[in-house]
A protein has these predicted regions:
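N-terminal secretory signal peptides that target proteins for export/translocation
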Residues: 1-2
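Sec-dependent N-terminal signal peptides
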Residues: 5-14
Length: 281
């Protein structure tokens, strides 16, 4: 039999482990106290990014995300052809001052984001990138980090989540290879499909989102998203998204953000709105 002294030591050890775990404030894999979340949108040429911006703004408005540090980036496209979908007004409504415009000024956006990333990494935090597009911008971030602070282990501290084969195929080959070698690159199932292990946020059916979203800011965000997506969907050779053309929704890129924050159990668009309904806050 174990002596009382050994039992006491084991009890104190277990208690200390429990206290350490419970003191770490996590949402899914994200440490609220240290980490930085980056939402990067190519916005070229599919208008699904526009719906995805509204979807991510909806998640960030939830009370559970109150202290999440985040930054969004517009125009993180790769080598694909086609026209850009301008959505600056939507970015401003959705993210306030927490976004950069890589389409208008790539170097300025890269500088702004690099500063945020370096600050987080130096303080021991991780970077979680939801890649709603290609990975060329992410490659530039990592190269900046390695040039400035080569001692930082980007493979351990920078996580890139990608759901789309198309996005990978339209990333410059050398940049895709680079991020896979120098970051924790995570490929999840396609967010356009229901029942494959990722939430399926593509639907050609209309979703009664107003039954769930009553917050005035979010109503404004979604209305602006629909306005922009409807204006540019298929316009001047841009991709014609069938879901958006039929009055449905496509915020499939949000599947990556759900994976990061532990909501990848959601099945479809309706379950998304049930989970993040304004009525729950």
């Amino acid at each position: 039999m174990l002596s009382k002294k050994i039992i006491l030591i084991l009890f104190v050890f277990c208690l200390s482990c429990t206290s350490e775990t419970s003191s770490t404030k996590l949402i899914g894999k994200f440490n609220i106290e240290k980490d930085l979340y980056l939402a990067q949108f190519d916005c070229k040429t599919d208008t699904d990014d526009i719906h995805s911006i509204a979807g991510i703004a909806t998640m960030l408005s939830d009370s559970r995300f109150l202290n999440v540090k985040y930054h969004a980036v517009a125009g993180t496209y790769g080598i694909q052809d086609g026209l850009y979908v301008p959505a600056n007004e939507l970015f401003e409504i959705a993210f306030g001052t927490h976004w950069s415009d890589a389409h208008s000024n790539f170097e300025q956006a890269l500088s702004e984001v690099t500063k945020l990333v370096i600050k987080t990494l130096k303080e021991g935090g991780n970077i979680w990138i939801a890649e709603a597009g290609q990975s060329d911008f992410s490659a530039s971030i990592i190269k900046n980090i390695k040039n400035t602070f080569p001692s930082i282990n980007t493979k351990f501290q920078i996580h890139i989540v990608q759901h789309s084969n198309w996005n990978e195929n339209n990333t410059a080959t050398d940049n895709l290879t680079y991020v896979k070698e120098n970051a924790d690159y995570i490929k999840i199932p396609d967010g356009n499909v229901v029942g494959n292990g990722s939430p399926g946020f593509y639907t050609e059916d209309k979703v009664n989102w107003r039954n769930y979203i009553t917050d005035s800011k979010l109503i404004n965000v979604w209305e602006k998203a629909f306005e922009i997506a409807n204006e540019y969907n298929g316009k001047d050779g841009r991709h014609n998204n069938p879901a958006i053309a039929n009055g449905g929704m496509d915020f499939s890129d949000v599947s990556e953000t759900c994976w990061i924050f532990g909501f990848n159990y959601l099945k479809n668009a309706v379950q998304f709105f049930e989970e993040f309904s304004s009525l729950n806050n």
